Amino acid sequence: MPLRKPIKPPELRQFANVWTMLGQPSSEKEWTMEQRFRQAKKEGFDAVGWGVIPEAAKLCKALDMTYVCYIDAHFKTFKDRLEMAADTEPARINVQLADHDTLPVEAVEVWIKMVEVAETLGLTIDLEVHRDTCTETPEKTWEIAKRYKEATGKKLRLSFDYSHFALVKHLSPPYAK
């Protein structure tokens, strides 16, 4: 029997999301973006995550950290959003795709196009399981992953924020009163 090549174990890399540092150390004297990044490094984080921050790439290089860029995207906006995110030189891009009422078949169609554009830009993208998006329930997420694999032969790259499944089918006003 042929020997299998050893599989490298996964590495856990922790990142601080900038939104967790808003209003710090106080709402009266909030940290600058640089201070937030430096604080994350000081606390032992490997990376920082947030939206399209122009200075992200420079700050991460200076602090020997990586950046995870968050974007929301829809059928008409995904190309522009990916191009803007590319400027942050992210290790990966976390995508919150479409809306809660987007059908899985529609989500897969746009996701396939997004992956193609991301690859041409040299980007790695992950679809985040998130409230008020096409992945807001486990059933929809499973359906999207299944359809993506059927269409491409590849597994869907997912980013799980486990807290969001606790909030499934979150509807914002005026739909929920």
Sequence positions of predicted segments:
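Active-site beta-loop-alpha junctions enriched in small/polar residues
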Residues: N17-Q24, G51-I53, Y70-H74, L97-H100, ...
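N-terminal pre-domain/capping segments
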Residues: M1-P90
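Active-site gating/metal-coordination segments in enzymes
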Residues: R81-A107
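Acidic/histidine-rich catalytic cores of soluble enzymes
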Residues: T120-K177
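Charged helix-capping and loop-helix junction motifs
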Residues: K29-T32, P104-I112, P138-E143, L171-A176
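Proline-centered loop/turn at the N-terminus of a beta-strand
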Residues: R13, T66, R92, T124, ...
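Hydrophobic residues within beta-strands of alpha/beta enzymes
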Residues: V48-G49, I93-V95, I125
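Alpha-helix-loop-beta-strand connector modules within alpha/beta enzyme cores
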Residues: A56-F75, I112-G122, K146-A151
